[in-house]
Curated annotation (Swiss-Prot):
Its EC number is 4.2.1.33. It is an enzyme of class 4 (lyase). Pathway: Amino-acid biosynthesis; L-leucine biosynthesis; L-leucine from 3-methyl-2-oxobutanoate: step 2/4. Keywords: Amino-acid biosynthesis, Branched-chain amino acid biosynthesis, Leucine biosynthesis, Lyase. The gene is leuD1. GO terms for biological process: L-leucine biosynthetic process. Catalyzes the isomerization between 2-isopropylmalate and 3-isopropylmalate, via the formation of 2-isopropylmaleate. This is 3-isopropylmalate dehydratase small subunit 1.
Length: 161
């Protein structure tokens, strides 16, 4: 279970992590600057297992992999959004960051306590006593996430061979 950090529509990668930090390659260092201009308290207050919740087109803008890397390094459980920019979605899956699509994110408020049942495909809003369905991921994407990202998934395929 974790806290919802609520954001709006069209959160672009420059808002997630500013371009001036692209010289940093350590995810833990990047995590210190996530949403720095939009919500300066985020990096200091986010806890392992929390959720970033947003509207439409999350991760739009430039295709930098630093954005999902920085988010993952904060310890969040997942990003929950109505929709994603395609390249952000792919980058997130590739590095093992859970990205969930839910059309009912408007019902989630900042600070709500959430829990996700990945098997049932449901988000439980413990604060409001509500449930919201998530769009199921194809099995091969679930397997990539379970392995921790595309590199680990590829290693597991090689080990199976």
């Amino acid at each position: 279970m974790g806290r919802a950090w609520k954001f709006g529509d069209d959160i672009d990668t420059d808002v997630i992590i500013q371009g001036k930090y692209l010289v940093i390659n350590e995810p833990e260092e990047l995590a210190k600057h996530v949403f720095e201009n939009l919500r300066p308290e985020f990096a200091k207050e986010v806890k392992k297992g929390d959720f970033v919740v947003a509207g439409e087109n999350f991760g739009c803008g430039s295709s930098r992999e630093h954005a999902p890397l920085a988010l993952k390094a904060t310890g969040i459980e997942a990003v929950i959004a109505k929709s994603y920019a395609r390249i952000f979605f792919r980058n997130a899956i590739n590095i093992g960051l859970r990205v969930l699509e839910c059309k009912e994110t408007d019902k989630i408020e900042d600070g709500d306590e959430l829990e996700v049942d990945y098997e049932k495909g449901v988000i439980y809003n413990k604060t409001k006593g509500e449930e919201y369905p998530i769009n199921p991921l194809p099995d091969f994407l679930k397997e990539i996430l379970e392995k921790g990202g595309l590199v680990e998934f590829a290693k597991s395929l090689r080990e199976r061979a």
